[in-house]
Design a protein with these regions (language model features):
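RNA-binding basic/glycine-rich loop and surface signature characteristic of RAMP-family CRISPR effectors
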Residues: 1-226
């Protein structure tokens, strides 16, 4: 198994809509149990898969279903949780009432838009708005790849995709929203046929808030082209 823990920073406003309307906006952001913005792991999976769709290995990595034939995904991706001012993940139920940094996410900016017709003009009654997360907000998530070798280029391809300058998350990407950069990457490989690795793998906490001492840190600048 290969596991990577990745911290992303929004370098432009981020619009990750919940798909539902409320009385404040047409497109509120997704929020977790603490009412803080987060990026669903399913969304990240879809974005990464779409970005890698031209690779011949895409189906074998992310799975496929074609008629009676199919294969499950070899990749598991957690939700990307907000990092607090202490750079710890907001994993699990937290008391955020006294935290000024986290309270700033209670009311988020709203951006106005106009729907454009196929003729390139504004549609009648085409105004809508959406909530966005602040530029500079950081999120952390983990990704696990089921691999037969410790040196799997599929993991490297995924990491290169995430660290690409063209990687975008959420809606409005053509309007400059959703630009992200990797600010931290930790990773480790576990050979589950080896007792020591198996023990370390089983003892690893699933909480993104917990330290991961056996992981190696990789600089973002080392990702592309390695």
């Amino acid at each position: 198994r290969m596991i990577a823990r990745i911290t992303l920073e929004a370098t432009s406003p981020l619009a990750v809509g919940s798909g539902e309307k409320d009385i404040i906006t047409d497109a509120p952001v997704t929020r977790d149990v603490n009412d803080l913005p987060y990026i669903p792991g399913t969304s990240l999976m879809g974005i990464i898969r779409h970005s890698m769709k031209d690779l011949k290995e895409s189906d074998s990595i992310f799975g496929y279903q074609k008629g009676d034939k199919g294969e499950g995904s070899k990749v598991l991706i957690s939700d990307a949780l907000l990092l607090g001012s202490n750079q710890k993940a907001m994993d699990g139920l937290k008391n955020i009432e006294q935290d000024e940094y986290l309270k700033a996410f209670e009311v988020l900016p709203i951006r106005q838009h106009v729907r454009i017709t196929e003729k390139g003009t504004g549609a009648n009654h085409g105004k809508f708005d959406e909530q966005v997360v602040y530029k500079g907000t950081r999120f952390i998530f983990e990704m696990e790849l089921l691999s037969e070798t410790k040196d799997d280029e599929n993991m490297q391809n995924i990491l290169n995709t995430i660290s690409s300058p063209t990687f975008r998350v959420g809606s409005g990407t053509r309007n400059g929203f959703g630009s992200m950069k990797v600010v931290s990457l930790k990773y480790a490989s576990y050979d589950l046929t080896q007792e020591k690795d198996l023990d370390a793998y089983l003892k690893k906490s699933s909480s993104l808030e917990e330290d991961w001492n056996e992981a190696m840190e990789k600089k973002p600048c080392e990702l592309q082209g390695t």
